[in-house]
């Protein structure tokens, strides 16, 4: 099931279990995963996109191996909050993904996640070549960590 509201996404999840964060691009999918208690997001890898069936098979293998219980997709909103073609493409990807990988899917505003990831990599004095290799899954880590922090806050506040 696909959820626009993070509160609904949280309600659809078991109490524990790892989540994945995806930063969907036209050529790559950055993947990050959380620990089972959903405290820390760790950038995992970048999947080079080919055909949807192949991309979905790779994501399903990761989900099975990591025993994921949910997926967060970064939703690329425009700076004014509206949704353009990239957001529509992300929503279509989610609709197709749940047909192959029947896990709860939530969306998270990904505005500036790549900028934050780039800044962190620059501060770590990462070479340009290495930044290009890891930027997508580091951005996925930022997206997922934002969700984990929000889920933690909702759990403490009883807002879910």
From Swiss-Prot:
It is found in: Cytoplasm. Pfam families: RuvX. GO terms for molecular function: nuclease activity. Its EC number is 3.1.-.-. GO terms for cellular component: cytosol. Keywords: Cytoplasm, Hydrolase, Nuclease, Ribosome biogenesis. GO terms for biological process: rRNA 5'-end processing. SMART domains: YqgFc. Its main location: cytoplasm. Transmembrane segments: none annotated. InterPro entries: RNaseH-like_sf (IPR012337), YqgF (IPR005227), YqgF/RNaseH-like_dom (IPR006641), YqgF/RNaseH-like_dom_sf (IPR037027). Could be a nuclease involved in processing of the 5'-end of pre-16S rRNA. Belongs to the YqgF nuclease family. This is Putative pre-16S rRNA nuclease. It comes from Cereibacter sphaeroides (strain KD131 / KCTC 12085).
